[in-house]
Design a protein with these regions (language model features):
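Residue-level recognition of single "structural anchor" positions
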Residues: 1-232
Length: 232
């Protein structure tokens, strides 16, 4: 006979705040489910003695970031953390909204390239355009959309505003209309680093792989996953 028990995650057996570790905790009424609620007088955050649903655990967001950067899919992450896929998708979007784009250093050489993926089905091509700083190998800007000047312009303009020393690209004609000749470089081996980064991305994130059954169902989720992978 299988015994059905509710798995409980104890937060405050010793009445210690799970957010800041302070012991200045007092009772603060009850929740709708009649569970005792506490409030920390130090950080002013509320919590209850235990949570029956693991999505409320304070380390879940850190695990979501870690698993996303390791390339796990939505269902794999939800299965390991024992939370629903709907909750996971909402958390991923929420985490991404709180991530700020890094400040771009002035006078640097940057490489720009585009990578093809798709959303919902393989006929709906979507392009990831991003810029990589040549010295630090870090992603400084990216955009997702159709392969048009509008999509490319958002990335290129951030580099121009940062007073980039050189912007290296491939021979895609669109760049000629967006980048000044004095900044633009299309020399051989000029995009070696970003081409290698493309391979890393396709290996790490299955949704970017060419031959795969994994795909993005939503543009919002795709952008959120990329923000977490690049800047978190």
């Amino acid at each position: 006979m299988v015994k059905n028990e509710t798995s409980c995650i104890r937060f405050s057996d010793r009445k210690i705040c799970p957010s800041c570790g302070s012991n200045h905790v007092i009772k603060n009424g009850f929740t709708g489910n009649k569970k005792q609620q506490f409030i920390c007088k130090s950080c002013k955050k509320r919590f209850i003695d235990y949570y029956t649903y693991k999505a409320y655990n304070h380390w879940v967001n850190k695990s979501i970031i870690q698993f996303t950067k390791e390339g796990l899919g939505i269902r794999s992450t939800a299965r390991i953390l024992k939370i629903s896929t709907t909750t996971l998708l909402k958390r991923i979007i929420s985490i991404a909204k709180n991530i700020d784009q890094p400040i771009i250093s002035k006078g640097k050489t940057n490489e720009v390239d585009e990578m093809c993926t798709y959303v919902r089905h393989k006929r709906n091509f979507i392009w990831l355009v991003y810029a990589l700083e040549k010295e630090s190998k870090s992603i400084v800007s990216f955009n997702v959309g159709k392969r048009t000047n509008k999509t490319l312009r958002r990335v290129v303009e951030t580099l121009i505003l940062s007073e980039a020393k050189t912007i290296c690209t491939d021979r895609l004609k669109n760049y000629k209309f967006l980048i000044d000749e004095r900044l633009h470089s299309v020399k051989r081996f000029g995009t070696n680093h970003i081409e290698r980064k493309n391979l890393t991305l396709r290996t790490a994130l299955k949704r970017l792989n060419r031959k795969t059954i994994c795909f993005s169902k939503s543009m919002v989720v795709l952008v959120s996953i990329l923000k977490i992978y690049f800047w978190c």
